[in-house]
A protein has these predicted regions:
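Residue-level signal for the nucleotide or nucleotide-sugar donor/cofactor binding architecture
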Residues: 38, 68, 112, 128
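Conserved C-terminal active-site "lid" loop/helix of NAD(P)H-dependent oxidoreductases
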Residues: 95-124
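Amphipathic terminal alpha-helices
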Residues: 128-144
Length: 144
């Protein structure tokens, strides 16, 4: 049995667009935290790869190749969809502005690597970088 650690699942219909439209703030760059992402389609493919090729008692980080801070992610989504970037606030001010659950989410920092996924499961991601996926999604929105 393998364990998949999958933070930050996104897809075309799982983006923080409403959050950006609402103007929900993000951490100031000096306080910003690292975050990890995986496209839902890549996660599904990774589940199958782990089922068929995963080694027993292994933990696989189900993340893409993007190294990005959370505020940078929100900025990239805003840029791709021509939305305003979120205001950036220092930690103390952000804590006074958002709910405790949102604050907890926005201050958790993770930096996971997917080398084991690539090496052992031999999975080539369809969406290796968040920015590439966002450009594709934005192009689809313009055609709709």
């Amino acid at each position: 049995m393998s364990v998949l650690r999958a933070p930050g699942i996104y897809a075309r219909d799982r983006l923080p667009l409403e959050r950006l439209r609402a103007g929900t703030p993000a951490l100031a760059p000096d306080d910003d935290v690292f975050t990890n992402h995986i496209h839902a389609d890549d996660l599904a493919r990774l589940c199958l790869a782990a089922l068929w090729r995963g080694r027993g008692a292994r933990v696989y980080n189900a993340v893409d190749d993007t190294e990005m801070k959370m505020g940078e992610y929100f900025d990239a989504v805003a840029e791709a969809f021509a939305l305003p970037r979120p205001p950036r606030l220092p930690r103390a001010q952000l804590q006074a502005t958002v709910s405790p659950a949102m604050y907890s989410f926005m201050t958790e920092s993770r930096r996971l690597r997917n080398a084991r996924v690539k090496r052992e499961l031999r999975l080539k991601l369809l969406y290796p970088e968040v920015r590439d996926a966002l450009r594709r999604f934005a192009g689809q929105s313009q055609r709709e």
